[in-house]
Amino acid sequence: SIPCGESCVYIPCITTIVGCSCKDKVCYKN
């Protein structure tokens, strides 16, 4: 998984629009 440079501790990943998802409080792209 590649880190997307976004955390998802308090708010969801905005980067989900480019295929990222929340894992361990950080957004990753599979």
Curated annotation (Swiss-Prot):
Transmembrane segments: none annotated. Disulfide bonds join C4-C20, C8-C22, C13-C27. The keyword Aminoacyl-tRNA synthetase does not apply. One of its GO terms (biological process) is defense response. Contains 3 disulfide bonds. Probably participates in a plant defense mechanism. The presence of a 'disulfide through disulfide knot' structurally defines this protein as a knottin. Belongs to the cyclotide family. Bracelet subfamily. This is Cliotide T6.
